[in-house]
A protein has these predicted regions:
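Macrodomain-like recognition of ADP-ribose-binding/processing modules
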Residues: 1-250
């Protein structure tokens, strides 16, 4: 009985790998026929260098109006890093990048919010691969294929419920470690844990930005772009302000 179960699991894993590899090696024009909606190429998304440059007066005023006291002191100016990050407001499942990050639950079997949206856009093949991963611990991350998504891969991470800085920081670090290990050069993050998990939005953004800045300081040659993807207007406002501190122009 045990041997039969092992063989069945092994067979399912092999089938899942075949399906994943089929999408990973598929020519781009052919893969685009499998997308379930619109897509945004990496080249169509402004770098922070250009985003800020196109709207500098409004963004500076916004920072002054919303932050009478800065939550952190501005980081040193490094123009090359400003071209490695982007701020995008919209649907993360539309991004044609190497990987998008899924704010998943411990089961990795889908849920509400961005988790459900990613599973719907990726198709049932994603769920089948996730079933083989035996879940994921809070603060950890695991990699799957992207299937019908414009993104090649999905990095699933489980954020903490409530304000637990070490665990949230671990989510971002683990995702970036996977990206570096797997030669994933463009990656998009949602706002992890800020929805029903209740992490305060500004506190979560500070951790995300600090972790990304630190990673880029040490690995900028291995990363083409890191995208902060917001959906709620409040998150967009927070990132528009705080990115001026972590990735200042002058």
């Amino acid at each position: 009985m045990l041997l039969r179960t092992i063989r069945k699991v092994s067979s399912l894993q092999s089938l899942s790998e075949l399906l994943k590899d089929r999408f990973l090696v598929m020519p781009l024009d052919q893969k685009r026929q499998h997308y379930k909606g619109e897509h945004r190429t990496l080249g169509s998304i402004l770098t922070w260098h250009d985003y800020f440059g196109d709207d500098e007066s409004r963004l500076k005023f916004q920072l002054q109006e919303n932050y009478k006291e800065l939550p952190v002191q501005p980081y040193p100016v490094k123009s090359d890093l400003n071209k490695k990050v982007s701020l995008f407001s919209g649907d993360i499942t539309a991004l044609e990048v190497d990987a998008i990050v899924n704010a998943a639950n411990n089961s990795l079997l889908g849920g509400g919010g961005v988790d459900g949206a990613i599973h719907r856009a990726a198709g049932p093949e994603l769920l089948e691969e996730c079933r083989l991963l035996n879940g994921c611990k809070t603060g950890d991350a695991k990699l799957t294929g992207g299937y019908h998504l414009p993104a090649k891969y999905v990095i699933h991470t489980v954020g903490p419920k409530g304000e637990k800085p070490a665990l949230l920081e671990s989510c971002y670090k683990k995702c970036l470690e996977i990206a570096l290990k797997e030669n994933i050069r463009s990656i998009a993050f949602p706002c992890i844990s800020t929805g029903i998990y209740g992490y305060p939005q500004q506190a979560a953004a500070l951790i995300a930005l600090k972790t990304v800045r630190s990673t880029l300081e040490n690995h900028s040659d291995n990363i083409e772009r890191i995208i902060f993807c917001t959906f709620m207007p409040a998150d967009l406002l927070i990132y528009e302000c705080l990115m001026q501190l972590f990735f200042p122009k002058n």
